[in-house]
Regions:
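Zn2+-dependent peptidoglycan hydrolase active-site motif and core
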Residues: 302-352, 374-376
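Primarily a LysM-type cell-wall glycan-binding module
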Residues: 1-29, 50-52, 56, 68-115
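Alpha-helical segment that forms one wall of the substrate-binding/catalytic cleft
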Residues: 95-119, 125-128, 134-142, 155-202, ...
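A structural signal for short beta-strand/turn segments enriched in small hydrophobics and glycine
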Residues: 272, 309, 313-315, 353-365
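Acidic, glycine-rich catalytic/binding loops that coordinate metals and/or anionic ligands
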Residues: 258, 301, 308, 351-357, ...
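Short glycine/threonine/proline-enriched tight-turn/helix- or strand-capping micro-motif at secondary-structure
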Residues: 252-255, 259, 270-309, 341
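Non-catalytic cell-wall polysaccharide-engagement segments
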Residues: 154-273, 410-435
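Short alpha-helical segments in extracytoplasmic peptidoglycan/chitin-binding modules
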Residues: 13, 18-36, 49, 117, ...
Length: 435
């Protein structure tokens, strides 16, 4: 080997890897990623386990120990049978007696963990372990006071007091790490007030989520302790055992999006008001798209238009402006393909248990559920509990319209056969689309 030729690294593709994301993480261009076996012709997913040859170009990288599997960071099928309330009650800590109003409901601490896990599709075991690691609330019955009560996860900010908002902030940051690694937009951790470090390129997304979260709240020295085997992982293992015992293969070889139609009725004209943006929280996985019905009045107004099922499925959730449609018919939102509809008005909203065909009515668009400035429908895809990036290796495809992201959330376009529909909250002529 000549001096000019870099050493070649042998890397085994992980579920969710694409040529683009792998190249970014290893600091090479996509053409330098090679394999003894055929690679995807487009930017699709690489089969898990496929061997890749990649030039070594990075130096001074962070720890490369994988802490938890991806399936233990997100709300994967293995989390579906976990009972958060029963577990917390059995531990006897303050979490089981904590109460807080969320929306119009009075929830226990464990119910809040359950709500945040479900909404953000983050594994409840990880959230519980974080609450224990940072606050000790899972096993310690002592009643906290002051900032320890108001800001249990240590993020002291006036806008996010209480366990619900603290956990929502945590879930968003874990998602930023996880999906930033998936998308190839995150390559470094940035420590609290003390610089940054390049992430080891062969880490998995679940581990990166933890490394990212601990970096934004700690100096590098404290961060190193948090991600060591005697840090967060020790607390997790004390509560739940070996995280790798819960490993679940999230993406099998050849996985494809099922056929989807645009989520409104045939012949209707709607506006494409939001390109790829956060599936639940605004900053996390850019998995969602927004559509709004035609209206002469802006803002949150009543609409008689209908959002419809983009594919056949069974309704497994219908509450608080939210409808989740399970596409594989097993009755579980976090196994196989599922669609999230947000901002569905309570009037005429389809109930849980409904079996829908493609094009059947879901409900009316509104501002109900979450933050919204105008009547619309927000739609996102999940596969085995993972939000699927709208402009990723499995692009959002509805009636042949393919989502393309912009440089900022909510920007972008839908493209089909040389046509382009631009995302704009203004509902301009360029944003109009019809089935």
């Amino acid at each position: 080997m000549s001096m000019e030729e870099p050493e070649l690294l042998l890397y085994e593709a992980q579920p969710g890897d694409s040529i683009h994301s792998v190249a970014v993480r290893f600091g090479v261009i996509p053409a330098e990623v090679e394999s003894p076996d055929p690679l995807p012709a487009n930017q699709g997913l690489i089969d898990p386990g496929q061997l890749l040859l990649i030039p070594r170009r990075l130096t001074n990288i962070g720890p490369d120990e994988r802490l938890i599997p991806d399936s233990e960071l997100i709300f994967s099928p293995h989390a579906s049978d976990f009972n958060t309330v029963e577990f917390a009650d059995a531990q006897g800590g303050y979490l089981s007696s904590y109460r807080q109003t969320v929306g119009t409901q009075w929830l226990s601490g464990a119910e809040i963990v359950e709500r945040v896990a479900l909404n953000n599709s983050i594994n409840p075991r990880v959230l519980l372990a974080m609450v224990e690691y940072i606050a000790g609330w899972v096993t310690d019955p002592s009643v906290p006071d002051g900032d320890a009560f108001n800001y249990p996860l240590g993020h002291v900010e006036e806008q996010i007091p209480g366990l619900y908002r603290q956990l929502t902030w945590l879930a968003n940051e874990l998602g930023n790490g996880y999906y930033g690694w998936r998308a190839g937009t995150l390559t470094d951790v940035h420590f609290w007030n003390t610089g940054s470090l390049r992430l080891a390129p062969d880490l998995n997304a679940g581990t990166v989520a933890l490394q990212h979260f601990f970096s934004i709240v700690h100096t590098q020295q404290v961060w190193e302790g948090a991600i060591s085997r005697e840090g967060f992982l020790r607390v997790y293992e004390d509560l739940f055992g070996d995280p790798w015992a819960y490993e679940y293969p999230l993406f099998e070889p050849g996985v494809e999006q099922p056929d989807l139609i645009l989520p409104f009725e045939l012949g209707k004209i709607w506006a494409y008001t939001g390109g790829p943006h956060g599936a639940w929280e605004r900053e996390s996985a850019w998995a969602a798209l927004d559509f709004a019905p035609a209206s002469s009045i802006s803002g949150c107004v009543l609409s008689e238009e209908w959002a419809v099922a983009a594919a056949p499925g069974i309704v497994v959730r219908s509450d608080n402006g939210t409808v989740v449609l399970d596409l594989d018919g097993d009755g579980r939102a976090h196994s196989g393909w599922a669609l999230l509809y947000l901002h569905v008005d309570h009037k005429d909203r389809v109930p849980v248990g409904s079996l829908l065909d493609e094009g059947d009515r879901i409900g009316h668009p509104s501002c109900e559920g979450g933050v919204a400035t105008g009547t619309h429908i927000h739609i996102a895809r999940m596969y085995n509990g993972e939000w699927i990036l709208a402009d990723g290796p499995l692009p959002f495809d509805m009636d042949g319209w393919i989502a393309r992201a912009g440089s900022k959330p909510y920007q972008g376009a839908l493209v089909k056969d040389g046509q382009e529909v631009l995302a704009c909250s203004c509902a301009s002529q360029e944003s109009l689309i019809t089935r």
